[in-house]
Design a protein with these regions (language model features):
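Hydrophobic transmembrane alpha-helices of multi-pass small-molecule transport proteins
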Residues: 49, 70, 110, 119-140, ...
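Specific transmembrane alpha-helical segments of multi-pass solute transporters/efflux pumps
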Residues: 16-17, 21-22, 50-100, 136, ...
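Transmembrane alpha-helical segments that form core, pore/gating elements
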Residues: 49, 107-109, 113, 144-201, ...
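Hydrophobic/aromatic residues within transmembrane alpha-helices
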Residues: 28, 37, 41, 87, ...
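Membrane-interface helix-cap regions at the ends of transmembrane helices
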Residues: 20, 24-27, 31, 45-62, ...
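Helix-helix packing/entry segments at the starts of transmembrane helices
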Residues: 39-40, 81, 95-102, 167-190, ...
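Glycine-/small-residue-enriched transmembrane alpha-helix faces in small-molecule transporters
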Residues: 1-39, 143-170
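C-terminal transmembrane-helix exit sites in multi-pass transporters
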Residues: 48-60, 84, 103-125, 251-270
């Protein structure tokens, strides 16, 4: 398997892991304050990242790499978790997943602005078409067409995340995918530890098991392991191209719900999935 195809495989694994992020955050925020959840998930992942760096004796990034790492930290360690936690106080997970369909487009735009990538016009046609198909479908099935403060928070989350994805994918070509997220987490660790203590609830007695499981998932998988595969995939296959795999993330979320919660899988879901796969394949061809 060549480097380009490896990028698609790694990107797909990363997206599959991220697919559980919003449902897990929705469950976790029912038991934890958004500020504590944002800080704790980053602090837990940061401690694990620090241990990994020390055990493997990874050398420090070059001086010029710290600014890009700060952007990654701002985008995916702080911005996206914070704004999604705030948004999920005002909406259910299904409605929040609507906005995830805009993430591939946001990432591709930042790939052009920050990474200098130049996909051709057909790539943009299929990227916009794919985002439009998934957005329309998820907006329809969410059953909530009203707009409010939660929608603003989710839009901010997508902007921060797209920026962090593109910057991290670019830096991964130089220092490696898992190294990028580990160093970004370590960079933000002192601040996140402070916030974790500041927002820590007086007691955990009333915190449900499901909320704790949600916190563990977003800390270990969404904040750390998923990025090992995702940033490596972006570096190998191209940021704009691999970003289109995120179109599958909302549909994966529905598939997870169907498998674990025995929810009904409709024909419309299968049709939209097929259409999305075609858009991803076309974007891959023209990227």
């Amino acid at each position: 398997m060549n480097k380009f195809m490896n990028g698609w495989v790694n990107g797909f694994i990363g997206v599959a892991i991220f697919a559980g992020s919003l449902p897990a955050t929705r469950v976790a925020v029912m038991g934890f304050d958004p500020g504590f959840l944002t800080a704790a998930r980053a602090a837990i992942a940061g401690i694990l990242g620090l241990i990994l760096i020390l055990v493997l004796k990874e050398k420090k990034p070059a001086k010029q790499d710290w600014w890009p790492l700060a952007i990654v930290a701002l985008g995916v360690v702080i911005g996206f978790p914070l704004f999604t936690a705030l948004a999920l106080q005002y909406m259910n997970a299904a409605h929040s997943i609507v906005f995830v369909s805009l993430l591939p487009l946001a990432t591709a735009i930042f790939a052009v602005l920050r990474g200098g990538e130049k996909p051709n016009q057909f790539f943009w046609i299929f990227a916009i078409l794919g985002s439009g198909v998934v957005f329309a479908y998820m907006f329809f099935i969410s059953g909530d067409t009203s707009l409010g403060i939660g929608d603003f928070y989710m839009l901010m989350a997508i902007i921060f995340c797209g920026f962090g994805y593109a910057e991290g994918g670019l830096l991964s070509r130089k220092i490696g995918g898992w190294q990028v997220i580990c160093w970004a987490l370590i960079l933000s660790l002192p601040f996140m530890l402070f916030l974790t203590v500041f927002y820590m609830p007086a007691s955990f007695e009333n915190v449900s098991t499901s909320a704790l499981v949600g916190l563990i998932y977003v800390s270990l998988f969404s904040m750390l392991i998923g990025f090992f595969f995702w940033y490596k995939g972006l570096a190998q296959g191209g940021i704009a191209a691999i970003s289109q795999l995120q179109l599958l993330q909302p549909l994966m979320g529905l598939a997870i719900a169907a498998a674990l919660l025995h929810e009904h899988v409709s024909w419309s879901m299968l049709v939209v999935t097929a259409a999305t796969l075609l858009c991803v394949a076309a974007a891959k061809k023209f990227a």
